[in-house]
């Protein structure tokens, strides 16, 4: 039996660890359980912002997953952002921001499959030259309520999926219901990326590489919603993890 693909997984720095009350590497078990269920083996990456270390870790792993968490530093995508909007960005972690930028760089250079969730597609877009909507309620008044963390395990919104996209191939539908738990979203798209799913108010819910870029890296998918919190109740949401692991098989 072949070994399970090793998936280098981004993490967040929790302020209180289980052993001592200091910074600790942290990751929700929903991510690791979804990867394991899809027959992948998660490898947690510390946020050390060390380019040589990250390069080596990507070389040894078969795929990369960017996970959710707090907000990117606004200066990374809009240094001129008004103070009122900038103040809505919370939980800034410069080490994580830089570590994930380096991780994305190496995943692309080494042509490794990449799956990005929640914060993940936002980081991917900014790292490749795109922008963010820093706070949907302030910058897109009248939009749907996207911050429904209390309903993270339920289907609350509907997305339209672009025909022929990787999202379409995975879920085999042009429309589906998802969960939602975010106040930020992908803004201006990076030149290498395209939006392949949106809610009815135009908010981007999935991004992929442009067709020309995808020839070198066929599996790069970012989902703003949280499939890892849905698959136990709605089995179809395990599909992106299975497709990702299949793309990662050595």
Regions found by a protein language model. Give the residues of each.
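Extended polybasic, low-complexity segments that bind anionic RNA or targeting/receptor surfaces
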Residues: 179
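Active-site-proximal beta-strand elements of phosphoester/diester hydrolases
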Residues: 221-224
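Short, positively charged patches
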Residues: 218
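Glycine-rich beta-to-alpha active-site loop
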Residues: 116, 121
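N-terminal beta1-alpha1 cap of cysteine-dependent amidohydrolase-like domains
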Residues: 1-115, 126-133, 137-170, 175, ...
